[in-house]
Regions:
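Kelch-like beta-propeller repeat domains
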Residues: 26-410, 414-757
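Bacterial N-terminal signal peptides that target proteins for export
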Residues: 2-10
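Bacterial N-terminal signal peptides
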Residues: 10-19
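Sec/Tat signal peptide C-region and signal peptidase I cleavage site
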Residues: 21-25
């Protein structure tokens, strides 16, 4: 058995073996109970809500798989190291997956996949070992029904990994066996294994119009340079780890729980953002091809930065197409993107960066919020994130595109733009600044200025889209809270400690014009890094999980935040609610469930101080991933609720449709008469705090009679892009609080557009 730091005292192995036996019995029954503690004080539950007890997939026993097998199908063997993992006779651990990424399927089940699978087998230093220790991530489908949870493993369990083999772009090239026997050393380990070159970790998830899900990108792990040999019969495999982005796209079919490969992107992408367009196609932006050493000998001009080329996926034929030079943009990893009501894609000045060290030489451009037009395939700069600076109104909407060094058309245009602006400013500086700053006093707001600019490791939540008096949707608002603020230096995109500052950005659409604005809101109770936001049917935003500081800079040294918070959209303030049971810092996740509750999971930290997985006394738990889930029941679940009886299974833009109400008793009848709004909520597809599909759309109630209501669908397809949604109705209780019903599943259809025939 190989030697490695022991994280669990040997005396616990007997009790863990017994626990594993009973867990196996539960697994064979297919059920694990979801236990909700009793509400001791009803008023407290109505004010703060309640978390269920944690629940998780049981351990399984069996034969440990071949390490070179591409599709590792089960967590196996019966030598438990702790309650999360099982160990074989060689000391290799196989652990239950944590929900680093998850998606709500149309039937209410949860698809999720692991993050950083295999880091538990690092012996000394993650930076030197993960290129060989990490393996492709497992996936699971979780079913929650009648108070029980059960799991199945999709096929293939690792989504098919990288069926075409890795496509690594190494600096060293193929230098193998240069010392000859008996020490056969390979300085490039990018092609020595097939069970770690297609990990789902750091892919993005997006929903397709037909109810399937697509994972875009992922990770190929290797060492560059690295040593892969045997010495005295013992394997030696270490080096400087590299994480390379994949070109792969993989589709999950919920009907048979299977994964299949679809078209490859033109660029490998690690941490990309994917978003559904109005016509059902998918836009992908950013990502990096090589995280640690972003140097590309075949394309030197693209070195030292993230991928600037955007691509569009045609759902009709499964192919990716590059969008052209003017569609390029320098963006952070996992840029916060949203589909606007006019079909443009809004970048909200947020993303991931490896703070405080940065990610690209041009990252100062990440401070500029912008919108991408899929029709013209161009970007328009709208403003400076968090400040009332209207770049689009001052004639500089294409400044960022012109500053892109790979834009061959930029030189003359940039000279002309700068020359014109200089002449105008010299002639009349006040007139030149007027279109940019509509209210100079806003720049004196200290909170706005401190919270302005690029925000790292934060959520960006599109607030409910609401129609105007004519039924048109012309304004979108976005809540940003927590994360880390922009650093002072241009090469430092973020600070170390989490912030509590929050703001709402807005985009108002007036014909072809888009006006950006921003305002500060009440802040979080404390600074929160990596908090996940969930939009509730009531328009409130739940914030869960995270830590007080950046757990990527120095993993394992943060303090987890257990107390959840609720944002009230009417007062624009946060308040504390119930405490979750388990600390969940890095790679946590959450999703709104069909009954209005919220599933919370994840926690897959990097090895402590980039060494091995161990919890430092008093700090965040870092002894491996947490495979458990818990469910938060918001305050509105502890009282009377309206109830939907029937509804359309599918609707088209512009249609009216009826919803039957369930007047099962006097309480339901009373609440049904008080219904004042109905909302369509897109099903969650979340990873690393982002969900490009996230949206809630308020539908006009055109008729409300006893036992039924009639709703009007938007006429704008970009407001409700085709795909799977949940329909909720909201009513006021006796205290005047908005209370949602349980939802009905509904599919929005639309005219799909093909790029390739």
């Amino acid at each position: 058995m190989k030697t490695r730091p022991s994280l669990v005292p040997a005396l616990t192995l007997i009790s863990l073996s017994i626990a594993s036996h009973y867990a196996l019995a539960a697994r064979n029954k297919g059920n694990v109970p979801i236990v909700s503690p009793e509400c001791v004080n009803e008023q407290v539950c109505k004010d703060k809500g309640l978390f269920t007890n944690p629940f998780e997939e049981p351990l399984v026993t069996g034969e440990f798989p071949d390490q070179d097998n591409t599709n590792i199908t089960n967590p196996l063997n019966n030598y438990p190291d702790n309650g999360k993992c099982e160990e074989n006779e060689d000391g290799v651990l196989k652990c239950k997956p944590a929900a680093g990424s998850l998606a709500l399927l149309n039937d209410g089940r949860i698809l999720y996949f692991n993050a950083l699978e295999g880091t538990e087998n690092v012996e000394y230093n993650a930076l030197l070992e993960i290129g060989s220790a990490i393996v492709n991530d497992q996936t699971r489908v979780l079913t929650m029904k009648n108070g029980n949870a059960s799991w199945i493993a999709p096929s293939p369990v690792d989504a098919g990994a990288n069926p075409d083999g890795n496509d690594s772009e190494t600096l060293i090239g193929d230098i193998s066996g240069f010392l000859g026997d008996p020490i056969d050393i390979d300085l490039g380990t990018d092609d020595d294994r097939t069970n770690n070159d297609g990990a789902l970790f750091c892919a993005d998830l997006v929903g397709l119009p037909n109810g399937e899900l697509m994972a875009v990108g992922g990770t190929d792990y290797y060492h560059e340079p690295g040593v892969n040999t045997e010495l005295l019969g013992q394997p030696i495999n270490f080096g400087l780890s590299e994480l390379e982005g994949l070109k792969n796209s993989r589709i999950f079919n919920p009907d048979d729980n299977s994964w299949r490969k679809t078209g490859d992107m033109n660029f490998g992408r690690w941490y990309p953002s994917a978003i559904s367009l109005a016509n059902g196609n998918v836009l992908v932006a950013s990502g990096v091809t090589k995280l640690v050493k972003p140097v590309y000998l075949t394309r030197p001009e693209t070195s030292g930065r993230n991928v600037t080329v955007t691509e569009t996926y045609d759902t009709s034929c499964g192919e990716w197409t590059e969008n052209g030079a003017l569609a390029e943009r320098s963006l952070p990893l996992y840029p916060r993107l949203h589909l606007l009501p006019n079909g443009h894609v809004f970048y909200n000045g947020g993303g991931q960066a490896f703070n405080p060290f940065g990610q690209g030489y041009d990252q100062a451009l990440w401070n500029i919020v912008a919108a991408y037009d899929p029709r013209s395939q161009t970007w328009a700069d709208l403003g400076f994130a968090g400040l009332p600076l209207h770049l689009s109104e001052a004639g500089v909407s294409d400044l960022t595109s012109l500053l892109n060094i790979t834009n061959s058309e930029a030189d003359e245009s940039l000279k002309g733009l700068l020359s014109g602006l200089t002449e105008e400013f010299i002639a009349n500086p006040f007139d030149a600044l007027a279109p940019i700053i509509d209210d100079p006093y806003k720049l004196a707001d200290v909170q706005s200025v401190l919270g302005a600019g690029f925000r790292g490791s934060t959520f960006s939540m599109m607030m409910p889209l609401k129609p105007d008096e004519n039924g048109n949707y012309n304004k979108a608002e976005f809540l940003t809270a927590g994360g880390v603020l922009t650093g002072v230096a241009a090469t430092s995109p973020g600070l170390y400690l989490g912030t509590n500052l929050a703001r709402i950005d807005s985009v108002t659409i007036e014909g072809e014009r888009m006006l950006y604005d921003s305002r500060s809101t009440g802040g979080l109770a404390q600074g929160r890094w990596y908090g996940t936001g969930v939009l509730l049917p009531t328009g409130e935003v739940l914030v869960v999980s995270g830590a007080d500081r950046d757990e990527v800079v120095l993993p394992g040294t943060g303090f987890p935040i257990l107390e959840a918070e609720l944002f009230d959209p009417e007062t624009e303030t946060f308040r504390k609610v119930a405490k979750q049971n388990r600390p969940r810092t890095y790679h946590n996740s959450a999703a709104l469930l069909p009954d209005g509750s919220v599933l919370i999971g994840g926690h897959a930290p990097i090895n402590t101080a980039y060494a091995y997985s161990v919890t430092l006394p008093g700090f965040s738990p870092n002894d491996g991933r947490d495979p458990s889930f818990e469910i938060y029941k918001p305050p509105y679940m502890f009282g009377e609720r309206p109830s939907i009886r029937t509804g359309a299974k599918s609707v088209h833009v512009g249609e009216r449709f009826r919803v039957g109400l369930k007047n099962s008793d006097a309480s339901a009848t009373k609440m049904n008469t008080r219904i004042e709004s109905a909302v369509l909520v897109r099903r969650t597809n979340i990873t690393h705090l982002i969900d490009g599909d996230q949206r809630s759309v308020e539908l006009p109630i055109v008729r409300h009679r006893s036992g039924r209501i009639v709703l009007q669908m938007p006429t704008q397809q970009a407001v409700v892009p085709p795909g799977d949604y949940m329909l909720f109705v909201n009513a006021r209780d006796d205290e005047g609080n908005l209370v949602p019903s349980e939802s009905k599943a509904i599919t929005v259809t639309g005219a799909l557009s093909a790029l390739c025939q």
